[in-house]
Amino acid sequence: LFQDSSIISGYVNTIIYVIGGTLLGLVMNIFAGYILSRATKLRGFMILYCVFTTMFNGGTVPTYMVIRALGMTGTRWSLIIPGCTNAVFMLLVMNSFAQVDKSYVEAAEIDGAGHLAIMFKVMWPQCKGMALVTAINTAIMKWNAWFEASIYVPNNTEYWPLQLWVKKITANATDYLKAATPNYDKGLLQYCVIVAATLPILLAFPFFIKKLEKGMVLGGVKG
């Protein structure tokens, strides 16, 4: 199975999309969550706007038209930027930031801290658990994504993620095996491909759980 260069290419592409999408989504969630948690005049409108997008989705065709208008079709960016975050993740991080004791923020403001210092030095250490929850969910969604690749980079096989190769191989297992060996087992190939696609994320899950448990119990001490 791993002698097929398409599987290796799929792994590399998927890792790129997972890392890029997760990091970009984490940054967007942190900044959006912080802004939404602050008491500003537009806070209510922005929260309502985020909630509205969770109930009404533009759909596949309008989304594709936007991606095409931005010139991202046929590129890796079409599989990294779209879907790296959503309104639910932003609201979760916002709620976590809003629960930080205001006395910490007031103490930082008295010491002359700006928004970036408050966000990363005061709020982030106490809310990293929830932020990591959104990051892990983003990573899992990026790892399992194949439909986006099938419409954004259908002819650019060098950009195909692992899951799209898995779909192609399992759907055409008979032809794939006939080309490789005359003594083939279609079911065995399908099982092997599925295990190869899911094993990495399953092995990483216990590590993520430990990080989440540690992050959830973090607190703060004013100094």
Where is each model-derived feature located?
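A hydrophobic, multi-pass inner-membrane permease signature
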Residues: 1-223
